[in-house]
Design a protein with these regions (language model features):
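Short, acidic, small-residue-rich periplasmic hinge/interaction motif at the N-terminus
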Residues: 27-43, 130-188, 196, 231, ...
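Extracytoplasmic beta-strand/coil segments of soluble accessory domains associated
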Residues: 179, 196-243
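Outer-membrane beta-barrel translocator/receptor signature
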Residues: 231, 247-252, 261-270, 275-350, ...
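Structural signature of Gram-negative outer-membrane beta-barrels, strongest in the C-terminal barrel
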Residues: 359, 478, 493-501, 505-507, ...
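Face-selective signature of the C-terminal outer-membrane beta-barrel domain
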Residues: 363-364, 369, 418-578, 602-604
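Gram-negative outer-membrane beta-barrel transporters
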Residues: 486-489, 558, 562, 666-684, ...
Length: 865
């Protein structure tokens, strides 16, 4: 998969003396004599080049361009500055600048001595006949030219031409107005003090920490509280992250194993319109494309004394020749947080990815990742027990000698957990011939989580009368393996370019899952022969997911494109009990299958204007245990027999119309409306070991997004800005809920807004300044179904950062929550009973929350090489 990118050196000027001037060249590349006293000046010669990424929108429209550039080459042959002198627009200028600043040259020489020179270049982009996103009918690839040194017609042009590979894994083509892609360069301008914050580069996605420590993030998008991943599919290089039938919750997606600096790109879709996305993709998908090389190596140290925050990350991109690309990294992290009871959260991450070019048509990549962490966590606090939180003062009997808790306190300081993850991955890519491409991925991973949550008070928290409290231990240990194979064919029918993709995905999870009642992390198995005869659950789960898909893309006219697809999925799951004394005796097999059609139409009246219409059917799976739960123990009223709403695959349908305009280079504005119907939701609640069958739901709303990206004449000059607003309306649509007025969707976001601006500005040859400001806002939302729902309080948070770099050294600071807002980051409706509150009557439901970060100063120092 290659393209032809000629690089033309049009002229050069030797710097450093008043007499220096452009020198005409001979056919051998030597300066032509201009007189008897002419100096012997040798022009710079290109030594190594870097590959330019073809701008995806330009490649889609088969645009070609030539970008005029002027670069300064120092005495060592390095490019120390570059600017565009002949702009082409459509993203070509930025791509050419990014590539040319990585070039190296044999330096120009005067009388044999290396000297600094200015070189004028022409970087040409030619749309390849076989580009990743090209629908044009295939044609014979041009023969690759060798390195050329030629005399121009005016005896003053040195032309250097090379063949350059197309970066495999270029950004996907945009098939919906809501699709987005964020490059590594833009990611480098954004604050990255936590891994889950990478999700927030996706327009409309909010990610919060709702218990502290290393527990997975809680995410929101388009009217969905997707908790840890129930309705958004997450991938790392095509490896699915959402955990099926997880001990803590369905779709559990912990991103703490990702080192932010190793992410090369973040791609995202909304809705169910992509045929290659299956389980959990009802609201959309987010894919982290990991880097196999980085522009620079870096060692970065972060400190936030008020949080007890320390983070050290080292990323190295070693050079093993032109056929290898490699990146390795390690991260050491420790944090106590603002809490009275320190989180003591420590983790260690390691990462390595390498790509080997096998020949002109194929390459293979390998990746390994490792993560280990342990922590304490604050958990959630009943608002009525917290000073100044607006839900009233606790009853005098609530606490002895204290009327209320600090928002930084904990109802159970023994909460916490530990987690490990190890993953190995390989991917093979080959251009089989001029029509067919193959991509095959194989992966295997092991993950383990031991979590001790207590969503309330350690003593008599649950409303069911249990005397031993509500802390539980959730253990999930799994081996997961799978493959993803895709075959793509490009051709034409009746003169219409077509692209056909067929694929198969297999995933098998072998899981050991346990759930125990605990107190202070001590298991209570058997302490009460009637109510707690043993573990709540102790069993083995084997779950196999099989997916096949086909997608056809056809372009009957330059301004019209259709994408239609179909996907078939099947789930086969077994659960077996491992403890005769377990509260839940779960044994059995369940299987289910679904066929999901997809359809998209894209109309482009102008090159700068696209109209989209999308339809798709999809699903999210439910915990296999919820198909069988039936507790014989009367003292656990939360347990119930399987409900008719219990389905292994909850079907969904999605619709979207939208438009995208690009009025000027670098600026993209989008507007879209969406509707999502979900047939039913049935997920296991890992905190209470009960099932929660829910009827059908519907969400609809609108989304507005804007993004601007600018690269100046100096490639170190960079500016980005983005804005996103989403309004969503979601309700249960079951007739019984409508009649009872209990149609509100708990925790579902109603309105969200985010905006940010950041940039990098060189102020001299050696100095560069950069900074950013972001604002994120979530409106009030409902805490329960109603009919008079509790309200979860909204919030608005502003963060800012600034930094300065001198040559290879950088210093910077970020201020998180500039206004020091006392905000509730994670919120839930919980029925709880505080210590010393009467056992009867059962307290009314209330909001429990995890406090968000206070104003925090975070500093960093970095060294680049």
């Amino acid at each position: 998969m290659r393209r032809l990118v000629p690089i033309s050196i049009a002229a050069f000027v030797v710097l450093g003396s008043p007499a220096a001037s452009a020198q005409p060249t001979t056919t051998e590349g030597q300066p032509a004599p201009s007189g008897p006293q002419a100096e012997a000046v040798t022009p710079p010669v290109l030594r190594t080049r870097a590959e330019a990424t073809y701008p995806p929108d330009a490649l889609r429209d088969r645009l070609e361009a030539t970008v005029g550039l002027e670069v300064i080459v120092d005495e060592t042959g390095a490019v120390v500055d570059a600017r565009v002198v002949g702009p082409a627009g459509h993203g070509f200028d930025e791509a050419a600048l990014e590539a040319v600043r990585k070039f190296t040259f044999e330096p120009a020489r005067r009388n044999g001595t290396p000297v600094r020179s200015t070189v004028q270049l022409a970087y040409e982009f030619h749309a390849p006949p076989r580009a990743t996103m090209d629908l044009a009918p295939p044609s014979a690839a041009p023969a690759p030219p060798s390195l050329l040194v030629q005399q121009g017609p005016d005896q003053s042009t040195l032309v250097v031409a090379e063949r350059s590979t197309v970066p495999i894994g270029a950004p996907p083509e945009r098939n919906a107005a809501s699709d987005s892609s964020t490059s590594q360069d833009e990611l480098s301008l954004r604050p990255r003090y936590r891994a889950e914050g990478l999700l927030e580069v996706v327009p409309g996605v909010f990610s919060v920490q709702h218990a502290g420590g290393g527990k997975a993030q809680q995410d929101f998008v388009r009217g969905f509280n997707i908790d840890h991943g129930t309705d958004m599919a997450f991938f790392v290089d095509d490896v699915p992250i959402n955990a099926v039938s997880h001990a803590h919750g369905q779709g559990f997606s912990d991103l703490h194993f990702v080192i932010p600096e190793t992410v090369g790109r973040v791609d995202s879709t909304k809705g169910m319109y992509a045929a290659h996305v299956g389980d959990f993709g009802t609201a959309g998908s987010t894919s982290f494309v990991m880097a196999d090389h980085t522009p620079e190596s870096i060692a970065r140290l972060e400190l936030a004394p008020s949080m007890g925050h320390e983070r050290l990350v080292v990323v190295e991109s070693p050079d093993f020749g032109s056929k290898w690309r490699m990146a390795v990294a390690t991260e050491v992290f420790y944090e106590n947080g603002p809490f009275i009871h320190p989180e003591n959260y420590g983790r260690l991450n390691a990462y390595a990815k390498a790509t080997r070019v096998l020949d002109e048509r194929s390459e293979i990549s390998f990746m390994a990742m490792a993560y280990g962490g342990s922590w304490n966590m604050s958990g959630v606090l009943p608002a009525r027990a917290v000073c100044g939180e607006g839900d009233g003062t606790p009853r005098p009997s609530a606490y002895s000698g204290s009327n209320c808790l600090s928002r930084w306190d904990s109802v159970d300081p023994t909460q916490g957990g530990a987690s490990q993850r190890f993953m190995a991955w390989t991917e093979y890519r080959r251009q089989l011939d001029e029509h067919w491409d193959l991509k095959a991925t194989l992966y295997s991973l092991y993950s383990n989580l031991q979590l001790f949550p207590n969503d309330g008070i350690a003593a008599s928290f649950q409303p069911d009368g249990m005397q031993y409290g509500s802390q539980v231990e959730q253990d999930d240990s799994r081996n997961e393996s799978g493959t993803d194979v895709r075959l793509t064919h490009r051709g034409a029918l009746g003169g219409m370019p077509m692209r056909t993709t067929i694929g198969m995905q297999l995933r098998n999870d072998v899981i050991e899952s346990q759930l125990h009642r605990t107190e202070g992390r001590v298991r209570l198995d058997g302490i009460d022969p009637v109510n707690i005869p043993g573990p709540i659950f102790d069993g083995h789960i084997n779950e196999l997911e099989t997916g096949v898909f086909a997608e056809e893309e056809v372009k009957p006219a330059r301004w019209l494109r259709f994408v239609v697809g179909v996907r078939g999925d099947r789930i086969d799951a077994n659960v077996s009990n491992e403890s005769p004394t377990a509260v839940y005796q779960l044994d059995g097999y369940k299987g289910a299958a679904q066929l999901s059609p997809k359809a998209t139409a894209i109309v482009s009246p102008l090159d700068e204007w696209d109209l989209f219409a999308n339809y798709g059917r999809g699903f999210h799976s439910n915990d296999i245990r919820s198909m069988f739960i039936n507790s014989p123990i009367a003292a656990l009223p939360s347990a119930q027999a399987p409900s008719s709403a219990g389905v292994l695959m909850a079907a969904a349908s999605g619709y979207e119309v939208g438009t995208t305009v690009r009025p000027v280079d670098g600026l993209s504005l989008s507007a879209m409306a969406f509707l999502i119907d979900l047939t039913s939701e049935l997920v296991i609640d890992g905190d209470t070991a009960s099932t929660a069958p829910a009827g059908p739901t519907q969400r609809y709303g609108a989304e507005l997004t804007g993004r601007y990206s600018f690269v100046g004449r100096n490639p170190r000059q960079r500016l980005y800005a983005d804005v996103s607003f989403t309004a969503a309306h979601g309700r249960f649509t079951d007739a019984a809920d409508v009649a009872a007025g209990t149609t509100y969707l708990p925790d579902a976001p109603i309105r969200t807004f985010s905006a940010g601006i950041g940039g990098r500005q060189p102020v001299s040859r050696d100095w560069t300044l950069q900074g950013d400001v972001t604002v994120r806002s979530m409106s009030d939302r409902y805490g329960d179904q109603g009919p008079t729902p509790l309200i979860e309080t909204g919030w608005t948070i502003v963060n800012a950062g600034i930094g300065a770099r001198w040559k290879f050294l950088e210093l910077g600071a970020d201020v998180i929550n500039i206004a020091d807002v006392a905000w509730r980051e994670g919120q839930f409706e919980v029925q709880s009973r505080l210590p010393k509150e009467p056992v009867s009557p059962v307290p009314q439901p209330g909001i429990s929350f995890t406090p968000g970060m206070p104003r925090t100063l975070m500093t960093h120092a970095a060294v680049y090489w």
